[in-house]
Amino acid sequence: MGLWLVLANQVGLVGTLVLVVCFTPANSLVRPLLLPGITALVSYGLILNKEAIANAGAWSLVNLNTAGLFLQYLDVGLISRWTYSAYGPTSSRGGQPNASLDLAGRKKPPSSSLLSRLQWGFSTATSWRAPSTVWEAKGTPHFEELPSRGRFLARNAMTLLWSVLVLDVMGLVGGDLDPVANAAHFTWDRVRFLARLGDVSRDEVILRATVVYMRWGAMYFSLQVVYSFLAIVFVMVGLSPVQRWPPLFGSFTEIYTLRNTWGKAWHQLIRQKVSSPAHYTTYSLLGLRKGGIAGRYTCILATFFVSGLLHLFCAEYSYGIQWDQSGTLRFYSIQALGIAMEDAVQATSRRLFAYRSTYWTRAIGYVWVLLWFLWTSPAYFFPLLKYDTEKRPPVLLGPIETWLQSRHVQ
């Protein structure tokens, strides 16, 4: 019964959003009046997800979608104010690309039929990057060449299997979870690094690096599994075309700066959702000047702060981590500081040394990014690891693990 309620909650959120963007004018009072109801549905959904879904990883993903739909409503319903008649956003207050296009420069709705409206509304509610449209989120990767439907399905099936296999291997290499060891190794004191650098042992550095980089790898492949699975289902049954499912991640050759890492290499699924309220707060509420240093970095900080709130509800909330033990907001907020630091270094280098990008500067950049995440990521990961006591059985390598265990016993 609980899972059916979870599904009903998701349908209610998506359905409300679809009806709002399809059938209400941009400035309709219905839109803000529905916000308390959306907030109540999301709050109930976060509680319901935890009670109905046993696997912590699964309910984290469902929580991400639940809280993400709240941000989606804020953006397309209230800030950017999408409508079917405009076939897109009607306001640029959320920093939406091309929102200022007049109606003559926009793609026209194919028809005014109910089915056409609902299809567009469903796409608007669920395609958070708005790929292959003029409203596409900045940094969204593209196909090198648009594949045929069959090739797309085959490629995503291989990606899905490969990603699951890698996660299985990572699970086997990681071994059994030891709650006692986790509680000792991943305390909040261990998050602090530079302040106690003289007391940090080589073994702790190795453990820290192993955990940080493996957790980022696990997040990468976990997101790829979900994305490839949904892409296969939606394209196979005809709910969306191939062009609505471009690659999830960009090129990891771009991770020589933090700005590129977050804006090009990592997924952009929530970029518009978290940047819209940040853009609105910075430039509409605070009235800071666009293009100014204060406005630019306030908006970056606000964007990462909103992203931190989203990840807090989808991850830490799932594990029951107390607020005073939480590091998610700290991790995401400090990324703005890192970007400001590297911007300052690059600007100074350009003025003093005629800086230009070379193989050597990129090599230094890769090291910088790896060290930055080695320093900052434990604030995000260690509280989760401390409370993570769930052994996740391998999906593909389960029989192999069983055979290895039987040989070990013999």
From Swiss-Prot:
Alphabetized UniProt keyword annotations: Acyltransferase, Glycoprotein, Membrane, Transferase, Transmembrane, Transmembrane helix
Compartments, as annotated in UniProt: Membrane
Region Disordered, annotated ranges: 90-112
Topology term for the membrane: Multi-pass membrane protein
Domain of life: Eukaryota
Glycosylation sites: 98
One GO CC term, this protein: membrane
Single GO BP term: lipid metabolic process
Transmembrane spans: 3-23, 28-48, 59-79, 157-177, 219-239, 300-320, 364-384
Record's keyword annotation contains Transcription: no
Pfam short name (any one): MBOAT_2
Record's protein name: Acetyltransferase aurG
Organism: Calcarisporium arbuscula
